[in-house]
A protein has these predicted regions:
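Hydrophobic alpha-helical segments, chiefly the membrane-spanning helices
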Residues: 1-319
Length: 319
């Protein structure tokens, strides 16, 4: 037990430093190309912080643990919205630009509707489903690149001092590597600790593994807040949730198709269909609708999301 605990701590340290460097590199690139931080957060930063989910879900699917791959994707979406974004909003509520949110939010709900449709109709995620999800990923990237090219140039970013471009790319790359390695250490050794305590695999997938692979987003969110980049944090969370459905699930399903887990039930019905997917939609609606309609996020909204996440985890450990 001592070695897993030590490796868990090493992973946490890698995540913290990796998140710091990754945010520095991403914001430097955003200033250099005069791109709004929200758009950078929804693409470049999201890809880097979603690497752990890609690695964990793909490995799980290839080794015959499809329930972990499935639970990790949905669990990470819930964790990102109801824990990470919630912390960001509760600590620093404020205004956001609805126009910058429209593309990632629209893509998320289109992907989520397709994902839920497959789960409720067939329950089997086949290779064609994975290819469709990957096609959505490509379309999302193209739309964001076009948005970046057409984005207006903020005056404050024009006046900001730019560092060496090679340094910014280096910070971005090294930060991403540290995040991926750190999350891998956390998930592997954290799962060993959880199993030693008798926690079921299905619960680990939706809670512990999802939280572990979402730690990069949490570290990036906290680091962004500390550096005064709240827009980057929110954009990262929403972009990461899009990637969890179209990239993470797309890659794992294409390489190793799987079905939704059948080992957990609520009132005799599949727990994922009754609770997991509905909660995923609920927390994302609560997170995004106020931002799109009013252009702002409030502290009560963040607290409500945190309460939902706490209740979700409590139910997972009780069924």
């Amino acid at each position: 037990m001592l070695i897993p605990v030590l490796l868990f701590i090493v992973g946490l340290l890698c995540l913290i430093k990796g998140g710091d460097w990754f945010v520095d590199g991403a914001t430097g690139i955003a200033r250099r190309f005069h791109v709004p931080e929200l758009l950078i957060g929804a693409t470049v930063v999201s890809i880097g912080t979603t690497l752990p989910e890609v690695m964990v879900s793909t490995t799980s699917a290839l080794t015959g643990h499809g329930e972990i791959a499935y639970g990790n994707a949905i669990g990470s979406v819930i964790c990102n919205a109801a824990l990470i974004a919630a912390i960001t909003i509760a600590v620093r509520p404020g205004k956001v630009d609805p126009k910058s949110l429209r593309t990632p939010v629209a893509f998320f709900f289109v992907a989520a509707a397709f994902y839920a449709g497959v789960a409720y109709t067939t329950g089997s995620f086949t290779r064609p489903v994975g290819l469709i999800l990957l096609a959505m990923f490509v379309a999302y990237i193209v739309c964001n690149v076009l948005a970046m090219k057409n984005a207006p140039t903020p005056e404050e970013e024009e006046q900001a001092e730019e560092g060496p471009f090679a340094k910014e790319l280096g910070l971005l790359a090294i930060g991403a590597v540290l995040i991926a390695v750190g999350a891998d250490l956390l998930v592997d050794n954290g799962t060993l600790i959880a199993q030693a305590l008798g926690v079921p695999e299905s619960v680990i997938a939706l809670t512990f593994v999802a939280l572990g692979t979402s730690l990069p987003e949490l570290v990036t969110a906290i680091t962004s807040l500390a550096k005064g980049h709240g827009a980057l944090s929110l954009g990262n969370v929403i972009g990461a949730n899009v990637f969890n459905l179209v990239l993470v699930s797309g890659v794992s399903v294409t390489l190793a198709p799987f079905s939704i887990p059948q080992n957990s039930t609520i009132a005799g019905m599949n727990a994922s269909l009754v609770m997991d997917i509905p909660v995923m939609f609920a927390v994302m609606l609560l997170l995004t609708l106020p931002a799109l309609i009013k252009g702002k996020l409030s502290r009560p909204q963040g607290i409500a999301l945190l309460c939902i996440y706490a209740a979700f985890c409590a139910v997972q450990f009780s069924i």
